[in-house]
């Protein structure tokens, strides 16, 4: 089976996405990376209606992207087109594309109505990264309700670029860790109360890193009375930072309904003990209480953090059990090769 994997990334991200997608190829499944980022700024098709406007106007950049994709599919004799990240392919274009089409969702309900659900009819298969959706429906139930033809759970994973493959398990366990608690992620207003509560409880022992504008930083400091300025991290600095951390907090934008981010794998993949939201859905990724710990609110999170900081042996055991699970089941090469089992039966009957 040959898959053209369409994604949009730039710089350091593009390099490792392209490299690691291609490297997952073996005798049974081959991957052809296709980066659709350079043709158009993603802001021009971030929402489905914006893409429809571009398609109606026959935007030259869009047409060049489509022509190049068609040529790659034909030259490679691809069986599958898999589309990830921001989806740039209009349903009327896909309708005439003679290949099995799979849509990969990676943001869940936070962006589903903008760039997922509008395209379901144009794809033969939907691969969703999390089983959660809302208090009313799970993601498979929602996809079924929306008329998706086929759908399967296909989680995100740990890229090799985001951990040090040279380190053995004993070496990861022995890393000197001088940061007690870390959070890495965007400083969304919905996350601020939780982060502020942890910061007030642990002070300098808790470090926050990630994406935050000047306005959000100012609001965060003024609203919660914190001397905390959140700064971004260069991609190449993620691993050294993770290797210094004892415990990592994972907080998703809609709590358990958006569980399944890349951070869910990056933290344990670097030997960081992870405490995450996710509720009843977390066991689709890890064994709760053994490979990961969970929390429901700020008070419970602070209690769990204090528990592990005062019990270093338990923290170390949680961290290394999580590390073993990631190395066994959640690396990107393993995840990509799972597509053969997920897609082959459907492609054969296409």
Label every PLM stretch briefly.
Residues 1-68, 76, 84-93, 106-283, ...:
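Nucleotide-sugar donor-binding catalytic core of glycosyltransferases
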Residues 343-350:
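Generic C-terminal helix-cap and adjacent flexible tail
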Residues 97-105:
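Short beta-strand/loop segments at the ligand-binding rim of alpha/beta enzyme cores
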Residues 261, 292-298, 307-313:
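Conserved acidic donor-binding segment of nucleotide-sugar-dependent glycosyltransferases
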Residues 309-343:
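A charged, aromatic-enriched C-terminal amphipathic alpha-helix characteristic of glycosyltransferases
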Residues 71-74, 308:
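Short amphipathic alpha-helix with an adjacent loop that forms part of the alpha/beta core around
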């Amino acid at each position: 089976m040959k898959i053209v994997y369409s994604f949009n990334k730039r710089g350091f991200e593009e390099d490792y996405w392209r490299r690691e997608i291609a490297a997952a190829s073996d005798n049974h499944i081959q991957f052809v990376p296709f980066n659709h980022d350079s043709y158009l700024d993603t802001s021009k098709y971030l929402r489905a209606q914006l893409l429809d406007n571009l398609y109606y106007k026959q935007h030259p950049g869009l047409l060049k992207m489509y022509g190049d994709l068609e040529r790659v599919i034909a030259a490679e004799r691809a069986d599958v087109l898999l589309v990830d990240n921001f989806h740039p392919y209009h349903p009327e274009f896909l309708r005439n594309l003679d290949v099995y089409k799979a849509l990969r969702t990676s943001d869940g309900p936070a962006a589903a109505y903008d760039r997922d659900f509008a395209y379901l009819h144009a794809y033969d298969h939907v691969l969703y990264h999390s089983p959660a959706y809302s208090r009313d429906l799970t993601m498979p139930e929602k996809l079924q309700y929306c008329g998706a033809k086929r759908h399967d759970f296909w989680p995100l994973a740990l890229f090799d670029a985001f951990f040090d493959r040279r380190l053995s398990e004993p070496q990861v366990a022995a890393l000197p860790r001088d940061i007690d608690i870390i959070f890495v992620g965007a400083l969304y207003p919905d996350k601020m109360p939780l982060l502020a509560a942890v910061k007030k409880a642990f002070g300098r022992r808790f470090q926050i890193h990630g994406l935050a504008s000047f306005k959000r930083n100012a609001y965060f400091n003024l609203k919660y009375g914190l001397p905390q300025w959140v700064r971004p991290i260069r991609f190449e600095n993620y691993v050294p930072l993770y290797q210094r951390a004892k415990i990592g907090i994972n907080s998703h934008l809609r709590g358990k309904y958006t569980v399944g981010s890349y951070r869910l794998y990056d933290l344990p993949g670097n030997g960081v003990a992870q405490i995450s939201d996710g509720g009843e859905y977390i066991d689709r990724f890890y064994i709760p209480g053994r490979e990961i710990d969970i929390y429901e609110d700020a008070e419970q999170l602070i209690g769990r953090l204090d528990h592990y900081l005062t019990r270093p042996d338990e923290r170390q055991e949680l961290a290394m059990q999580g590390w073993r699970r990631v190395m066994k089941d959640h690396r990107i090469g393993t995840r990509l090769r799972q597509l053969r089992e997920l897609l082959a039966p459907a492609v054969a009957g296409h």
